[in-house]
Amino acid sequence: MNLAEICENAKKGREYALLGNYDSSMVYYQGVIQQIQRHCQSLRDPATKAKWQQVRQELLEEYEQVKSIVSTLESFKMDKPPDFPVSCRDEPFRDPAVWPPPVPAEHRAPPQIRRPNREVRPLRKDVGAGARGLVGRAHQISKSDKPASRDKDYRARGRDDKARKNVQDGASDSEIPKFDGAGYDKDLVEALERDIVSRNPSIHWDDIADLEEAKKLLREAVVLPMWMPDFFKGIRRPWKGVLMVGPPGTGKTMLAKAVATECGTTFFNVSSSTLTSKYRGESEKLVRLLFEMARFYAPTTIFIDEIDSICSRRGTSDEHEASRRVKSELLIQMDGVGGALENDDPSKMVMVLAATNFPWDIDEALRRRLEKRIYIPLPTAKGRAELLKISLREVELDPDVHLEDIADKTEGYSGADITNICRDASLMAMRRRINGLSPEEIRALSKEELQMPVTRGDLELALKKIAKSVSAADLEKYEKWMVEFGSA
């Protein structure tokens, strides 16, 4: 046996452990422990053999420490307490012929979320405790092979961290229940959870000019069923699908953001990229997972922007098989999501809110499931004046500016066009001030020198530079479709 090789392997194992290369360190430790074991078998002197056994025991303890570090690092990735090694003297005696008593599970009622006056949806009961353990649930029971004291320490530490975070955020003492993604890929669940708009987009109804009919319908579809659950039953059940149709820039996405802010429901903002995957069968699984999560976090609003890109007309020559499967799964889930139709409880409803600029490309079956189809038109004269006030409320206006006169000149402009006009006009004074100045002189300008009021000439000049983005032929096409398929 080469003693120099044993020393070299032990040295490398310790060096790799100090450098953080724990996998290589464990390999060297295992090798040197086996070499010492074989060397001890060849020794005849008891004193020498005892010394080598002591060296082997010390290296074995070092190996266990490295292994414990690796286990701790893995536990951080798995989001659960690490599995520390337990010595034999700490392990109670167990008779292999006798089953141990069952470990009592902790039954904690899930706290309320979003609305304090509504009942919290209970956790899913159809998933076993074993499946919950695979995904590292927060309500996971402690394993019998862990020390009880360590489990108590981790639970107490977790409660302290949560309490500290709630105090810092000004939140309530309750924690939001987590969706149990057993049976689904963890990455898919996390991708959809990122699409939950947990923080308000800060868009209110007052920030949207005009569109009173659309606001009224959305309040009726989302807010009123939560306020009057006893009324919205049977034939009065809430609408399970609303489609907003109109030319670009008329405020469809703004209405969806206002729903997320004002209505107090869980809001999923979904796009075509969210429900698309390169792997076969995964897109359909994403659609099914989306609606299962929506039912769990109900009441929920699922907003699908540009829905024509996901569920266009089926049966065309250029349709791909994978696209057809996704459309079929979406139609099935929407038909089975009927909110009050399923559980007769409007507070557990799931509503699909969709927006499109090409309603004529939408599949007929999807059009039927989107029960309310409303037209979001170009703003009226009153709406254009309100939009000018909203867009220019943060800047100073010259006294000669009359927004009603500017609104009359913007007939045929969309809301986005009017916003662009206001933005361009607010930059006119800055452009005049920095004209002909060097970069050093521009940087030396004070904020007060740039805060010049917006004049009537600035708005008229911006109006000449920016043309309409919607043609009369497009408007006629939308109005014709609404006459044939509208349901306001």
Swiss-Prot record:
Residues 116-127, 142-167 have a biased composition (Basic and acidic residues). Interacts with KATNB1 and KATNBL1. This is Katanin p60 ATPase-containing subunit A-like 1. Gene3D superfamilies: 1.10.8.60, P-loop containing nucleotide triphosphate hydrolases, Phosphotransferase system, lactose/cellobiose-type IIA subunit. The modification Phosphoserine is found at S172. It catalyses: n ATP + n H2O + a microtubule = n ADP + n phosphate + (n+1) alpha/beta tubulin heterodimers. The lineage of its organism: Eukaryota, Metazoa, Chordata, Craniata, Vertebrata. Its EC number is 5.6.1.1. It comes from the Eukaryota. It is found in: Cytoplasm, Cytoskeleton; Cytoplasm; Cytoplasm, Cytoskeleton, Spindle pole; Cytoplasm, Cytoskeleton, Spindle. Regulates microtubule dynamics in Sertoli cells, a process that is essential for spermiogenesis and male fertility. Severs microtubules in an ATP-dependent manner, promoting rapid reorganization of cellular microtubule arrays. Has microtubule-severing activity in vitro. The keyword Transcription does not apply. The keyword Ribosomal protein does not apply. Belongs to the AAA ATPase family. Katanin p60 subunit A1 subfamily. A-like 1 sub-subfamily.
